[in-house]
Amino acid sequence: SAAGSASSAAGGPIPKTAHVAMLTSLEHFEIKEFPMPEVGDDDILVKVEGCGICGTDAHEFKRDPFGLIPVALGHEGTGEIVKMGKNVKVDSAGNSVKLGDKVVTCMIFKDNPDITMFDLNKQNVGGADVYGLLPDDDVHLNGWFADYILIRGGSTFFNVSDLDLDSRILIEPCAVLV
């Protein structure tokens, strides 16, 4: 199919629904079940393997300073590619990707999918959002506090298969320090 394999790299079937820990009100998560979204030609479906908890997650949980509720939090996550669109061949650094690879993601450029994270050093780029801090929409799998996340075309993501789970979870917090 144009949208890639219907089973995970581990050989198991991809479920028809996904579960999301949705922040539905201040200090209140609900486990919501949503239909598994379609994977477009430029998208990647990732089975979440782990996610750190950031101070930003705690602020959103306590006060919703960004006015995002309802929201699927979690932006320090990592997981395994279980389905990918036919146009996905390389990550944001140009490294090849395939089913079973471990990835992290940071930004989605909804206004201009041709922008890459490397353009951030060259120009003031607007329209960038962060997974785990996206307003809820019809996809719902927008944060790493879920069992699956849909990385949409136009997102930055990196193949980090050479790292163990703990190291992969620490990539985003360490990147903030650089």
Where do the model's predicted regions map?
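Short N-terminal strand-loop motif that marks the start
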Residues: S1-T78, D147-I149
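Glycine-rich beta-strand-centered segment in the early N-terminal region that forms part
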Residues: P35-C51, D64-D114, V160-L163
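Short, glycine/acidic-enriched loop or turn micro-motifs at the edges of active sites
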Residues: E60, K86, A175
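Short loop segments at secondary-structure junctions
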Residues: L26, V82-V88, G153-S155
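NAD(P)H dinucleotide-binding glycine-rich loop of Rossmann-like/cofactor-binding domains
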Residues: F109-V178
